[in-house]
């Protein structure tokens, strides 16, 4: 019987990017024959965001568990039953809360980036202390650590040179929905007509947060205009 990898999407409800990152890693696992020979995937998600993972509904190697509720004690009991009696071998991304500490040996950690170190002015004192405490606990463990970029891996070495975790870099890569593959030249032209786009354009989908540093994009466009 296959062991299971649990992907916990409940911890990313406040950040949609984290859920899409989980979706991407699940998709990558499903394409890996070695992983699929040994494991099946379990996703724990809330009803509000379950549709993000609809593409996995028909996959026999994915068990989607939709948990509806905000009671922390009931959720903890649900997670404990799922992990203890559900054949779960690994938990991603494990949070080092009271429940997570019970399953630390099964944990795979994830730190998206180290913004609180490089841009501390964007965080309050309490949040900074909380992030630093968590990062020290995770990097001081010998559990596997997933990072989202080689830049984050360099930051890990810079800020936590004595870390014990084994690091794997898994880049942010967008899962391409089937609908995108069906886009035709006619549909493209209809979008151009709708928004009166008579010339080539650049689409920048980043949200307007200060740390996204949109000025780099503006400066790049200025350079292109100067170069003709």
Annotate the PLM regions.
Residues 1-228:
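Carbohydrate transferase catalytic cores enriched for Leloir-type hexosyltransferases
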């Amino acid at each position: 019987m296959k062991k299971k990898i649990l992907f916990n999407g409940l911890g990313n409800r406040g950040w949609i990017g984290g859920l899409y990152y989980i979706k991407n890693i699940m998709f990558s696992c499903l394409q890996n024959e070695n992983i699929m020979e040994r494991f099946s995937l379990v996703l724990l998600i809330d009803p509000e965001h379950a549709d993000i993972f609809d593409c996995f509904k028909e996959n026999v190697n994915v068990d989607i568990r939709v948990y509806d509720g905000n009671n922390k004690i009931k959720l903890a009991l649900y997670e404990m039953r799922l992990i203890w009696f559900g054949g779960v071998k690994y938990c991603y991304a494990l949070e080092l809360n009271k429940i997570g500490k019970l399953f630390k040996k099964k944990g795979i950690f994830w730190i998206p980036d180290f913004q609180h170190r490089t841009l501390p002015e964007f965080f309050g004192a309490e949040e900074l202390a909380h992030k630093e405490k968590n990062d020290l606990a995770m990097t001081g463990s010998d559990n596997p650590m997933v990072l989202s970029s080689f830049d984050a891996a360099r930051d890990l070495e810079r800020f936590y040179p004595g870390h014990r975790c084994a690091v794997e870099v898994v880049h942010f890569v967008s899962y391409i929905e089937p609908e995108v593959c069906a886009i035709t030249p006619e549909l493209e032209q209809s979008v151009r007509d709708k928004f009166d786009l008579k010339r080539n354009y650049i689409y920048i989908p980043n949200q307007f947060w200060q740390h996204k540093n949109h000025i780099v994009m503006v400066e790049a466009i200025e350079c292109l205009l100067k170069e003709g």
